[in-house]
């Protein structure tokens, strides 16, 4: 049985925590930043966890990470 390929796009966007949960970065941080408040941009810098409903699908994309 061959190994499962890692989805390289997902590998660059997600990483697993020590307890096995999946971390992600928030969106809306790359452009059109002048109209966003400093507080909003600061809060967008903080990473967050993937929703429980999406966790299984993302785990399949990054099996060895």
From Swiss-Prot:
GO terms for biological process: translation. Residues 1-28 are annotated as: Disordered. Pfam families: Ribosomal_L35p. Keywords: Ribonucleoprotein, Ribosomal protein. InterPro entries: Ribosomal_bL35, Ribosomal_bL35-like, Ribosomal_bL35_CS, Ribosomal_bL35_sf. One of its GO terms (molecular function) is structural constituent of ribosome. Residues 10-26 have a biased composition (Basic residues). GO terms for cellular component: cytosolic large ribosomal subunit. Gene3D superfamilies: 4.10.410.60. Belongs to the bacterial ribosomal protein bL35 family. NCBIfam families: rpmI_bact. This is Large ribosomal subunit protein bL35. It comes from Syntrophotalea carbinolica (strain DSM 2380 / NBRC 103641 / GraBd1).
């Amino acid at each position: 049985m061959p190994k499962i390929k890692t989805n390289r796009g997902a590998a660059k966007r997600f990483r697993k925590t020590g307890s096995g949960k999946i971390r992600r970065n928030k969106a809306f941080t790359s452009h059109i930043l002048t109209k966003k408040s400093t507080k909003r941009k600061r809060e967008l810098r903080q990473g967050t966890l993937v929703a429980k409903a999406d966790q299984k699908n993302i785990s399949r994309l990054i099996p060895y990470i």
